[in-house]
């Protein structure tokens, strides 16, 4: 059909075949080159991944080594601190053991001395008894001789003669009896005084108050005189609002840069003081702000009262205490007696009573508890009728306190006789705290009244010539009439004055009564 040149066709076919083969070869080589490139890239990627893995492993290794070193350092530090604490504990235990050993040695030495003293005293008593027996025998012999003599030479009956002889014998040995009584009384007083001094000195060495208790401050300082006008407010509305909310009178007078707060309740006075201080510092003073600040101050005071009571309970270690009693203790931080802070005084009495109890083998914790609560009635004595003693007894009875605590409260001012050793110790600790120099201040009027009363009591006793109160009322020196009072009467006068002072006066500590009998003979040489 078609006229095709055979050689040309063959040539064309060969060209096509050759081209196809060439294209296939070119494609093959291109594919091989691409494959090699892919392998090379994959190899490079693998090498990069391996290198990154090595770097990450190396970094992780370094971090783990660092953390391990830090943990080792921390453990070593904790171990060193633990060793240090254990060493300190061991040192403290050794120190306590040494102190305990020293105390036991001192106690042993004291007991040895006391035993020697008791043996000597017993020996003296035996000697005195033998002397008295001898004197008694002599007196009996003398009486018999006198009876026989009088019966033979007198018409007196036996009974009349005996009465006459006994009167003579009484007169002859009265001086000896008085001397014996005086010696024994002085000896007993000396032993009791030395023992009491030792116990009290040990107790006071183990506890001493840090500072003299402060007075309650009722003066608020203000920056300038203009602030007084702002406190008063327009038509006095600010000061009226503050007085109505706090129950305290504000006295704004000519005192420079100061406002005086006057109120019977110390807690209210402290609330007013804090509120006024905040208002003065803030500068915004108006009825709304005053109400807000007073409420804030009242909340702060309530919190402070609770914390103060809890701190007192914790410090004295008296055990579990009812929350209401804790609050009453906290209120006493704003109460003062003769300038002495009542809460600090109660803490001081608690420690002193505890130390005294420990020295004589009584319950130390119970003594501290009684000492801490002994003035609890002063927390509300301005709100409730009655003395702080009766209020305290009622409160402690209501909260089921131990009978020793109630007894200590009832008797620490001598209103009733103490029924337990704890009550006696609390009264002694109370007197120690009150009599400590600087603990209390006393007005001049009451001081002079006490000295005058002391001299009047002494002068009222029969046979007294003059009496002088000396040593700030700690001693009364009495001069007696020598013609009316003999040596035996000195003891009776001293005892009478002592009993009257104890019955009629209230005083801290003790009062020494010294009675002096002096007889003078004078003449004039011409």
Curated annotation (Swiss-Prot):
EC number(s) on file: 3.1.-.-
CDD domains registered for this protein in UniProt: HDc, KH-I_RNaseY
EC main group: hydrolase
Transmembrane segments: 10-30
Compartment annotation: Cell membrane
Gene3D superfamilies, per the entry: Hypothetical protein af1432, K Homology domain, type 1
Protein name, per record: Ribonuclease Y
Gene that this sequence comes from: rny
């Amino acid at each position: 059909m078609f006229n095709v040149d055979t050689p040309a066709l063959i040539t064309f076919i060969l060209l096509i075949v050759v081209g196809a083969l060439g294209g296939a070869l070119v494609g093959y080589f291109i594919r091989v080159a691409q494959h090699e490139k892919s392998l090379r890239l994959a190899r490079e990627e693998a090498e990069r991944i391996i290198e990154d893995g090595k770097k990450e492993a190396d970094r992780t290794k370094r971090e783990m080594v660092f953390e391990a070193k830090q943990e080792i350092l921390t453990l070593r530090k904790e171990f060193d601190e633990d060793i240090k604490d254990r060493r300190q504990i061991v040192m403290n235990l050794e120190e306590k053991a040494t102190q305990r050993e020293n105390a036991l040695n001192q106690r042993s030495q004291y007991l040895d001395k006391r035993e020697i003293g008791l043996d000597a005293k017993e020996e003296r008593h035996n000697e005195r008894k033998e002397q008295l027996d001898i004197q008694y025998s002599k007196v009996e012999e003398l009486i018999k001789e006198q009876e026989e003599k009088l019966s033979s030479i007198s018409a007196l009956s036996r009974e009349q003669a005996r009465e006459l002889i006994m009167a003579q014998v009484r007169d002859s040995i009265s001086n000896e009896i008085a001397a014996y009584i005086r010696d024994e009384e002085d000896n007993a007083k000396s032993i009791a005084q030395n023992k009491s001094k030792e116990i009290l000195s040990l107790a006071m060495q183990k506890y001493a108050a840090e500072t003299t208790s402060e007075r309650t401050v009722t003066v608020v300082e203000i920056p300038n005189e203009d602030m007084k006008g702002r406190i008063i407010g327009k038509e006095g509305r600010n000061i009226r609002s503050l007085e109505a909310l706090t129950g305290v009178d504000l006295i704004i007078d000519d005192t420079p840069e100061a406002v005086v707060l006057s109120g019977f309740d110390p807690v209210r006075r402290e609330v007013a003081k804090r509120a006024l201080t905040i208002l003065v510092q803030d500068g915004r003073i108006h009825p709304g702000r005053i109400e807000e600040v007073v409420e804030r101050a009242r909340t702060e005071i309530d919190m402070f009262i609770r914390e103060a009571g809890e701190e007192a309970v914790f410090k004295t270690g008296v055990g579990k205490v009812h929350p209401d009693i804790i609050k009453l203790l906290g209120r006493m931080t704003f109460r003062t007696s003769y300038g002495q802070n009542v809460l600090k005084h109660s803490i001081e009495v608690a420690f002193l009573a505890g130390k005294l109890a420990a020295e004589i083998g009584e319950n130390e914790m119970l003594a501290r508890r009684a000492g801490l609560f002994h003035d609890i009635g002063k927390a509300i004595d301005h709100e409730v009728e009655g003395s702080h003693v009766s209020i305290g007894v009622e409160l402690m009875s209501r909260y089921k306190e131990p009978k020793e605590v109630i007894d200590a409260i009832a008797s620490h001012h001598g209103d009733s006789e103490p029924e337990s050793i704890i009550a006696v110790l609390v009264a002694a600790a109370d007197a120690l705290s009150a009599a400590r120099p600087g603990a209390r201040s006393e007005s001049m009027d009451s001081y002079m009244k006490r000295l005058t009363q002391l001299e009047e009591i002494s002068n009222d006793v029969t046979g007294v010539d003059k009496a002088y109160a000396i040593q700030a009322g700690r001693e009364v020196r009495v001069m007696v009439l020598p013609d009316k009072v003999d040596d035996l009467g000195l003891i009776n006068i001293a005892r009478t004055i002592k009993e009257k002072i104890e019955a009629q006066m209230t005083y801290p500590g003790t009062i020494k009564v010294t009675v002096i009998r002096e007889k003078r003979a004078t003449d004039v040489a011409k």
